[in-house]
Amino acid sequence: MSAGRLWSSLLLLLPLFCSKSSSCGLSTHVEIGHRALEFLRLQDGRINYKELILEHQDAYQAGTVFPDAFYPSICKRGKYHDVSERTHWTPFLNASIHYIRENYPLPWEKDTEKLVAFLFGITSHMVADLSWHNLGFLRTMGAIDFYNSYSDAHSAGDFGGDVLSQFEFNFNYLSRRWYVPVRDLLRIYDNLYGRKVITKDVLVDCTYLQFLEMHGEMFAVSKLYSTYSTKSPFLVEQFQDYFLGGLDDMAFWSTNIYRLTSFMLENGTSDCNLPENPLFISCDGRNHTLSGSKVQKNDFHRNLTMFISRDIRKNLNYTERGVFYSTGSWARPESVTFMYQTLERNLRLMLAGSSQKNLNHVSSPSASYTLSVPYARLGWVMTSADLNQDGHGDLVVGAPGYSHPGRFQIGRVYIIYGNDLGLPPIDLDLNKEGILEGFQPSGRFGSALAVLDFNQDGLPDLAVGAPSVGSGQLTYNGSVYVYYGSQQGRLSSSPNVTISCKDTYCNLGWTLLATDADGDGRHDLVISSPFAPGGRKQKGIVATFYSHPRRNDKELLTLEEADWKVNGEEDFSWFGYSLHGVTVANRSLLLIGSPTWKNVSRMARSSHKKNQEEKSLGKVYGYFLPNRQSTITISGDKAMGKLGTSLSSGYVRVNGTLTQVLLVGAPTHDDVSKMAFLTMTLHQGGATRMYELAPEKTQPALLSTFSGDRRFSRFGSVLHLTDLDDDGLDEIIMAAPLRITDVTSGLLGGEDGRVYIYNGMYTTLGDMTGKCKSWMTPCPEEKAQYVLTSPEASSRFGSSLVSVRSKGRNQVVVAAGRSSWGARLSGALHVYSFSSD
């Protein structure tokens, strides 16, 4: 078959294979398996399983997708649906372990090694599906974006995850051939069922369809990014990071099942507890406190059929125990993928060459800091303070995804000390700088940071959030650790105070803030978790612990001991997603964002259950502490806008008048773009509102608005005000971390990101980005004093940012959360220096 004919066949096959079938998720499962292997270390036993799997990637990758092979109707009209269903549960793993131990004693030959690698891939799929389908991700996605419809989220999420994977991640590790241990699988199924339930031809045909689909996804699936981004902002924002069922959480659970599988392969199952749900397997005498449930993961099928033509079968190579699938010439570099990449490069060069250089663009940072550890999430959160009391600002950076071999996502915090020149003006690998390291498996230490004097000894202390502590028990309670400062300017090497939460899925420490909560003029510790139950489901919790000199060393506190605590008002409203403290007329005002608030009370009065105008409006609450009743409320007015995702405040001149302002981000707000006489909707382009904080007014008055200029850019998802030119006014800094450079928003390019800096002297009333000299609106660049552009494509430049002040200069540090400069998706920090000239 020619490359063109096969390419056409793949385009036809993809929608048939994926539409409304839970057999999709091939790219997602392959990516999970790849990440799980990165930090795998199984110390006990006679076999180096990591080396074995690395040697047999062809079998391992095929195994990560295999359990879904027989679900879709395209596979023999769905006749073997039950075979796929049974492959997802512990009895299949148990049968496989016994089969290998009975038939293939150590040392193993190569075919048996491939069988073992294939089995490891299957176990990854098992536990990943449970987190994705049954426990966490899709259920929350349904609640947030699909009116509590799990089935709608399921339909969009399975294939949408593949679209997002292909758009955001580089699959250059994908093996060009796969191996399926056909003979061994047939015998395992015979043992599992006690009879013959499937034939060799069915097994080969249906797994080969998976192989073709996986490589078909590599060609064109990423071009559907805009479709699935529009359907579900939650999918785009939480796909990798969500605490229960996000990619990294599924990779963590894969490493757990690998440890158990290796133990059973070498020692048998007699010392193991094997419930039907593989998440609850244990071989150490301990079991999880949660009870497992078996939920059938497939609900949708079509009566479709397809056969594999004879001329495609020439890419199958049978062996005594299995079959190899290969791509042939159609997937080589000169294929469609290569043509897409070449077209993208040429268009980028053409656009760059034809456009006049913008004088306000800053494309080169003064320094960049990286890590050589993949998936570290460097710069997930940052703060600055003079920790060593030398008069210079220091930079504190969280990397909650940092891992060691055998210690997945324990997390780290890095401290970079400033001097007369500010932060070090050279590129750094931060592993050589000051470090605090987490100690709980997948605890994600470093997810939140706050600097305050918690024990009031005159020295700055550091609070660090680890919201996924307890993930190994499926409780995700979370913890906050406080490290006391010392006279030597260094922090304690171990936490002096630990604050914990007893509620399942509490996620304590997701956000931290230092602000004066009791009116004594000293900062106190504010802790929030938008995912905490709050009495029901993800209402969110915000709590405050006052700083005082009676704080003891090695103190253990619980959330119930908080001095001040407030819950969200609606399920899945994510109260506490953002926090900001500000002083207004000598009173402490705590602002709390609830971006997925949807006005349930008004929805209940509506005659339409699915009122499109009520979803994720967002809301901001303002509390004059220590009052527990909100005095200020600001509500969103646009469905899916998520007002309150970000908050910041400062002083600027508005039409020449000095004004204390509050900025509120709505990064998934839709806007209208005008291009000459044409108009189009900028879905999730993002907007920011600027309000006046006036002591004589009960509610803040809206002054100005800012809007992004690209679809899906999330303009305003990060906000910051700081005085960069020492004129007594704050500059307004806004980030659009998902901004795609080309106007097609997904057909070419990736999530590059961009940061805009507006001079605080020149803000005006009304639409700041709508009055444009150019032929296109909005125009966020025109009024900006500086536009920081990403030095790396597809890096989510602007995922977080912070300002650092020293005696000699003011600096802005911008994180690129998906940078691969140091290692794959490890993150990077870029430093920009500004003077008062």
Curated annotation (Swiss-Prot):
One of its GO terms (biological process) is complement receptor mediated signaling pathway. It is an enzyme of class 3 (hydrolase). InterPro entries: FG-GAP, Gprt_PLipase_D, Int_alpha_beta-p, Integrin_alpha_N, PLPC/GPLD1. This is Phosphatidylinositol-glycan-specific phospholipase D. This protein hydrolyzes the inositol phosphate linkage in proteins anchored by phosphatidylinositol glycans (GPI-anchor) thus releasing these proteins from the membrane. GO terms for molecular function: glycosylphosphatidylinositol phospholipase D activity; sodium channel regulator activity. It catalyses: a 6-(alpha-D-glucosaminyl)-1-(1,2-diacyl-sn-glycero-3-phospho)-1D-myo-inositol + H2O = 6-(alpha-D-glucosaminyl)-1D-myo-inositol + a 1,2-diacyl-sn-glycero-3-phosphate + H(+). Its main location: secreted. Residues 1-23 form the signal peptide. Transmembrane segments: none annotated. FG-GAP repeats lie at residues 364-425, 431-492, 494-554, 561-619, 629-689, 701-767, 785-837. It comes from Mus musculus. It is found in: Secreted. Its EC number is 3.1.4.50. Gene3D superfamilies: Integrin alpha, N-terminal. Monomer. The keyword Repeat applies. One of its GO terms (cellular component) is high-density lipoprotein particle. Glycans are attached at residues 94, 267, 287, 303, 317, 477, 496, 586, 599, 655. It comes from the Eukaryota. Keywords: Glycoprotein, HDL, Hydrolase, Lipid metabolism, Repeat, Secreted, Signal. Belongs to the GPLD1 family. Widely expressed.
